[in-house]
Amino acid sequence: RIVGISAIYTSVSKNGTSVFFKRKKKNISSKVFKFKKSLDVIQLHAVKEPYTELGTLFLHPDFRGKGRGSLLSLARFKFMALWPERFDKKVVAEIRGKVDKDDNSIFWKHFSKYFFDEEMFNNNEISYINNSFISESIPKHPFLVSPLNRSAQRIIGIPNDNAVPAFKMMRSQN
């Protein structure tokens, strides 16, 4: 009986650009009006060189606890250490963000409406196939977070409920 699985994806970005958003602060000021302000912004970043991604980690709820999730996670590093020639030098871990009751990204639902027709695609499905349309269609300059819907603002950088244990484990290892 299989109760858990973890995965490693190699050469991500080898056949096309991978994209992600980075949240940061943008400071603005005016000597004339004598003010300084710090704004929350997100900016699209493209990764063109291949990298290895720590992928799926799933453990059946009946078997969670007692370090089993950590074992599944760390097994990936052991595997990479045994066969380093199979993996890229850069290793990335992506944590899935918050989703609604229909399993759609809350952030993407609110952000993408400025650039795409909602009926155009199911974003999760098409982005796993090829997300280059994102880097082709979205401007490269920073976007203010404040115009986004409040629910979208609150969940930027917050992991999906099912990913919280993995997120905490990675943060503790950093």
PLM regions with names:
Residues F35-H60, E136-I156:
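Alpha-helix-centered segments that form part of catalytic cores
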Residues I2-G4:
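Glycine-rich acetyl-CoA-binding "A-motif" of GNAT/NAT acetyltransferases
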Residues E119-N174:
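Long, charge-rich C-terminal accessory regions
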Residues T10-T56, F115, M120-Y128:
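Conserved acyl-donor/pantetheine-binding loop and adjacent beta-alpha core of acyl/acetyltransferases
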Residues K37-L39, T56-L59, R64-M80:
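Conserved acetyl-CoA-binding loop-helix of GNAT-fold acetyltransferases
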Residues V47-L57, M80-R96, I106, Q153-G157:
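Conserved GNAT acetyl-CoA-binding A-motif
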Residues L72-A75, E85-I126:
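Glycine- and acidic-residue-rich phosphate-binding/metal-coordinating active-site segment common to enzymes
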Residues A7:
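Short hydrophobic beta-strand segments that form the core of ligand-binding sensory/regulatory domains
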